Amino acid sequence: MAETSGPQSSHISSSSVGEKGSGCAVRDLLYWRDVKQSGMVFGGTMVLLLSLAAFSIISVISYLVLSLLTVTISYRVYKSVLQAVQKTDEGHPFKPLLEKDITLSSDSFQKALTASLAHVNHALKYIVRLFLVDDLVDSLKLALLMWLMTYVGAVFNGITLLILGVLLTFTAPIVYEKYKVQIDHYVSLVHSQVKSITEKIQAKLPGALKKKSE
């Protein structure tokens, strides 16, 4: 038993360390710790979404591939002409990248699949609880949210919502970091009001429909 516990514990610890590292990287990206990196991701995402709003996805992908090929082919021809003029033999300009190992190992794939599967199973379980009314209040919240989304969908399309989502994702963390105390205060007030209303609703429900005590 002692021999098998070692590899398992090291596998779990390495997986948790990897998840923490990726979480910190995303946090740094959203909080603009590296302005250049965050700006590139934000700008690239916005350009892609705005392109999808104006053109079809097939056109956007085609233009992206053509742009990339234009850059790489032009650079390849330029280096070849330069080597011919200077009579040098530096080889293929992209040789270091071509020789770089970009294969996905089975271990990395298995770790990513395991982590994703845990989130998927949790989401499926929660969705089943909502649709089968395990908690009436939570199911009513979902119904209210979907009813509001029908009005949102009548005004905005999916791409517009994604653009707004990206804008909020890259601006809300900075605003929260700057006005954390004030925002936490108002969020606490709203949470207290929602909790009070929820408790009143649950108190008026029949016993079989009340939220199960854990």
UniProtKB/Swiss-Prot annotation:
Keywords annotated in UniProt: Endoplasmic reticulum, ER-Golgi transport, Golgi apparatus, Membrane, Transmembrane, Transmembrane helix, Transport
InterPro entries tied to this protein: Reticulon, RTN1-4
Residues of the Reticulon domain: 26-214
Major place of residence: endoplasmic reticulum
Listed transmembrane segments: 46-66, 155-175
Entry keyword annotation includes Transmembrane: yes
Job description of the protein: May be involved in membrane trafficking in the early secretory pathway.
Protein name in UniProt: Reticulon-3-A
Species the sequence originates in: Xenopus laevis
Gene behind this protein: rtn3-a
